[in-house]
Every structure is written in C-alpha cells, then in structure tokens.
C-alpha cells in the first residue's frame, strides 16, 4: 500500500515524537521521492530526521576511534575496534550518500526560492563534510572539495538574497566556519567568517522578525561560543569543548 504525502508526513511526525529517527527519515525520503518541492515544514522534518540518524553514527564513530587509539598495545582488542569502526563508517557513508542523492536528484533542482536553495546547498556541504570526517586518501580530497564547493555556492546566494539575521544564512556561516576550522585546519579563515557573520547580524538586529528571533539569536550565540573557543585554542589553551554546529 503506497501512502500519500500527508500520511507520510504524519508518520514522520509520529516517528519524531517517538524518537525513531530511522523511521522518520524513511518517511521523509519517500515524500521527497514523490518529486514535489517540499514545504518549509517538510524540509525541516527531512533535515531533523537525517541529522539525528547521521548524528548517532558520527558520535559512535568518535567513541570507537578514541577507544581504538587507546588499545594500541593490545592487537586483538584493536582489531575488534577497527572492524566495529568500519561497520559504523559503512552505515554513515550509506546515510550520507542517501541524502546527497536526494539533494542532487530532487531537492536542489526543485528549489524555486533562494532560501530553499541555500538550505539544500548547506545540507550538501554538511553531508560531504560528514563523509570527509571518515574518509582518507583521494576520497578525502574529493569529499572535502565537494563540501567546500556546496558551502561556497550557498554562501554567495545567501549574501545576495538574505538578511544577515536570517537563521538559514547564520546557520550556513556557522557550519562553513566549522568546516574551515575542523576539516581545512584554517583557524584564521574560520574565525574571520564567524566574526563577520556575527557582526553583520548584530548590526541589523532590528531586521529580526518574531518567528526567527529565537533561532537567529541561538545561532549567533553558537558563533560567539566557537569564536571564544577557537581564539583561546590558538593562543595555546587547549580547549576540549566540541564546536557547536547547526
């Protein structure tokens, strides 16, 4: 029995309430594959679903990688760790490739508004960034380059078409700066991007509308937290907090 769009969306909302994000992602993938442009609500449901699905694997991957490094003296334990990490990596790669396929085949081509285009290109940058975190060799170079390209394209559209206080523009600046810091190891570029985004938003705080006030100020806070962390790390204080991202 094929479900119509409203039933699938309802199923995704139920799955979100139950914190069953794999089900939520499957429902929103089916909505996307129907080929219509997504509403803002549908777009957010899709994004939340996959962010949780991939987030669980990213977190598991970090834990296992760290355990693997600590068991260097015990070959058997290390081998087990390696195999388990590779299993998680394969899951993570499948999820990212799923999302990237939806973006390239349906979401980006169907986006009629600049806001949606920026949202989906940011998402493309994010999922290539997640792939690059677990990639090596040529594969790493390709994923890093694809991520940067998507972020850059989104960044240019956002500067031309959106207010500096728009939560999607701010969220993009946040994640693009994390990309520079973590993936390209360019702290100066990361700080400059985050600081510019923060300062431009502060200068236009009066353009904030009611709806997005909470989202925008939260992301501005994350930009500021990252700037504080990165500045202290570069002055030699080893901060251990993870970067905030959107």
From Swiss-Prot:
Cross-link Glycyl lysine isopeptide (Lys-Gly) (interchain with G-Cter in SUMO2), where in sequence: 51
Phosphoserine PTM sites in chain numbering: 60, 186, 232
UniProt cross-references to CDD domains, sorted A to Z: 14-3-3_beta_zeta
Keywords on record: Acetylation, Cytoplasm, Isopeptide bond, Nitration, Phosphoprotein, Ubl conjugation
GO cellular component: cytoplasm; melanosome; perinuclear region of cytoplasm
BP terms from Gene Ontology: negative regulation of G protein-coupled receptor signaling pathway; protein localization; protein targeting; signal transduction
Site (Interaction with phosphoserine on interacting protein): 58, 129
Major localization listed first in the record, in broad terms: cytoplasm
Coiled coil, from the record: none
SMART domains for the chain: 14_3_3 (SM00101)
Known function: Adapter protein implicated in the regulation of a large spectrum of both general and specialized signaling pathways. Binds to a large number of partners, usually by recognition of a phosphoserine or phosphothreonine motif. Binding generally results in the modulation of the activity of the binding partner. Negative regulator of osteogenesis. Blocks the nuclear translocation of the phosphorylated form (by AKT1) of SRPK2 and antagonizes its stimulatory effect on cyclin D1 expression resulting in blockage of neuronal apoptosis elicited by SRPK2.
Name of the protein in question: 14-3-3 protein beta/alpha
Annotated source species: Bos taurus (Bovine)
């Amino acid at each position: 029995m094929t479900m119509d769009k409203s039933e699938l969306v309802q199923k995704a909302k139920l799955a979100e309430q139950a914190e069953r994000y794999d089900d939520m992602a499957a429902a929103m993938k089916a909505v996307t594959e129907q080929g219509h442009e997504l509403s803002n609500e549908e777009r957010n449901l899709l994004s939340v679903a996959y962010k949780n699905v991939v987030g669980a694997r990213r977190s598991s991957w970090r834990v296992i990688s760290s355990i693997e490094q600590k068991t260097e003296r015990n070959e058997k334990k290390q081998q087990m760790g390696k195999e388990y990490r590779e299993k998680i990596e394969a899951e993570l790669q499948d999820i990212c490739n799923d999302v990237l396929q939806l973006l390239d085949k349906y979401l980006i081509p169907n986006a009629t508004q600049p806001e949606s285009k920026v949202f989906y290109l940011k998402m493309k940058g994010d999922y290539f960034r997640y792939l690059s975190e677990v990639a090596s060799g040529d594969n790493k170079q390709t994923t890093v380059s694809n991520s940067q390209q998507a972020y850059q394209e989104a960044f240019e559209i956002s500067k031309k078409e959106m207010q500096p206080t728009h939560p999607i523009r701010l969220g993009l600046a946040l994640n693009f700066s994390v990309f520079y810091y973590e993936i390209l190891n360019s702290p100066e570029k990361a700080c400059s991007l985050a600081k510019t985004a923060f300062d431009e938003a502060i200068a236009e705080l009066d353009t904030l509308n009611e709806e997005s006030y909470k989202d925008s100020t939260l992301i501005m806070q994350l930009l500021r937290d990252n700037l504080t962390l990165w500045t202290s790390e570069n002055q030699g204080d080893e901060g251990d907090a993870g970067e905030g991202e959107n």
